[in-house]
Regions:
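A short core secondary-structure module
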Residues: 130-145, 153
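DPxDG-like acidic metal-binding loop motif
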Residues: 56-82
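Glycine- and acidic-rich phosphate- and metal-coordinating loops
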Residues: 40-56
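Glycine-rich, charge-dense phosphate/pyrophosphate-binding loop(s)
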Residues: 30, 39-40, 45, 86, ...
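Residue-level signal for inorganic ion chemistry
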Residues: 1, 27, 61, 127, ...
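N-terminal beta-alpha supersecondary unit
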Residues: 1-42, 148, 154-155
Length: 186
């Protein structure tokens, strides 16, 4: 993301490939929320250089919104605290506060209650199946149950966790299941 401050009060967002209408883009919405919540009359020209695949489940949109809040807070000199930025971010998406938090954290509630945790270093292999997984579609799906017993930090650190969305995602996007099964053989 590139940010240029303007005195016009307008938010102009350009991107290379998302195809999302500007007013629905989390970057634009984050900038607008920051303006409204602070009464800031400044604007910005924002350019997105998209590198993560849309619908890949990697939090790209939420990370971009968090970066926008943090970046424009500095650029516009609105002097909001990290906690205030996290509160604005929560209005836009449950995982946005995590990206503002800026370190590994245990999330509770809908993702807004964060506790810093230390995690051992790990390596990740990212496989990108030919699927655009819609977060909204997954969370609205009838098959996504809300009856999972909460797990505590200690149990997670000792035994790991699970992904409640996995069964729904794999039923709607078989190519995701194929990729997981392929990885499981190693």
């Amino acid at each position: 993301l590139d940010f240029d401050r303007t005195d016009t009060g307008k938010i102009c967002l350009t991107d290379e490939q998302t195809g999302v209408p500007v007013t629905e883009n989390l970057i634009f919405r984050a900038a607008r929320c920051l303006q409204e919540d602070t009464g800031c009359g400044l604007g910005a020209n924002i350019h997105l250089h998209k590198r993560l695949p849309m619908g890949g489940g990697l939090g790209g949109g939420s990370s971009n919104a968090a970066t926008t809040l943090v970046g424009l807070n500095a650029l516009w000199e609105t002097a909001l605290s990290k906690q205030q930025l996290m509160t604005i971010g929560e209005k836009l998406g449950a995982d946005i506060p995590l990206f503002i938090f800026g370190q590994s954290a245990w999330a509770e509630g809908i993702g807004e209650q964060l506790t810093a945790i230390e995690l051992p270093p790990v390596w990740y292999l990212i496989v990108v199946p030919d699927a655009h997984v819609s977060t909204g579609k997954i969370f609205a799906h009838q098959g996504l149950t809300r009856n999972t017993h909460p797990i505590k930090i200690r149990a997670f650190l000792e035994r790991g966790g699970s992904n409640d969305c996995q069964a729904v995602v794999e039923s709607l996007y078989p190519q995701v299941k194929e990729a997981r099964l392929w990885l499981a053989q190693f």
